[in-house]
Regions:
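Short acidic, glycine/Ser/Thr-rich loop/turn "cap" segments at secondary-structure junctions
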Residues: 80-86, 114-123, 136-144
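Active-site flanking loop/helix segments enriched in acidic
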Residues: 44-51, 55-65, 69-92
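Alpha-helical phosphate/pyrophosphate-handling elements in metalloenzyme active cores
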Residues: 82-114
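Short amphipathic alpha-helical segments, especially helix-boundary/capping motifs
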Residues: 36, 74-79, 110-115, 132-135
Length: 184
């Protein structure tokens, strides 16, 4: 196995920074630039300092590795009391949202990695049975004098505090904000 020397590592880092600046110049003035990405905490491990992925690409990977994301697989998007091939799974819904969001973002020259990360993570905190479950939880919470269950806030909670055995993932503030505000 060939070990990279410092000059090679520096060249790759400089090239990544150059590509980031070039990409940022292609974005709309209203878009969040990759170079403006802010992480909640400083990275814990040294190997991430040499990561050639852009910050929002890192967020995509972290969301894809979330156990909450992996649980999308067998969840239906809507509650149904009968079997139907026409009731989509949550994983398909999330893929459709991601695809449509990226298409819109591309047309507006927005940051596609930020959009994809937000779209993939937008439903991580849904209650069982989707919006029906969320309404049922809210009724019970109101009866007991508590606040509301908001799946968008629960999505952020899952990412920051529940994933990785309570360590959470270090996802950018911009992605967390997009997930938190995705439903208005």
């Amino acid at each position: 196995m060939k070990v990279m020397n410092m000059k090679e590592e520096e060249r790759i880092i400089k090239n990544t920074i150059k590509r980031t600046k070039e990409y940022d110049r292609t974005l709309s003035p209203y878009a969040c630039k990759t170079s403006e990405c802010q992480k909640l905490r400083k990275e814990e491990s040294e190997h991430e300092e040499f990561d050639i992925r852009w910050p929002f690409e890192e967020d995509i990977g972290r969301i894809l590795y979330c156990k909450s994301y992996q649980r999308y697989t067998d969840k239906t998007q809507a509650l149904s009391f009968f079997q139907s091939a026409h009731i989509s799974k949550r994983s398909i819904h999330v893929q459709w949202v991601s695809r449509i969001a990226r298409q819109i973002g591309k047309g507006l020259n927005l940051n596609l990695d930020l959009i994809e990360a937000a779209a993939l993570g937008h439903d991580l905190g849904h209650a069982p049975y989707g919006h029906v479950g969320e309404r049922a939880l809210n009724e019970k919470l109101q009866e007991k004098g508590f606040g509301y269950f908001c799946h968008n806030a629960n999505s952020v909670r899952n990412i920051l505090y529940l994933e990785r055995n309570g360590k959470g993932y270090n996802v950018s503030l911009q992605v967390l904000d997009a997930i938190l505000c995705h439903n208005g």
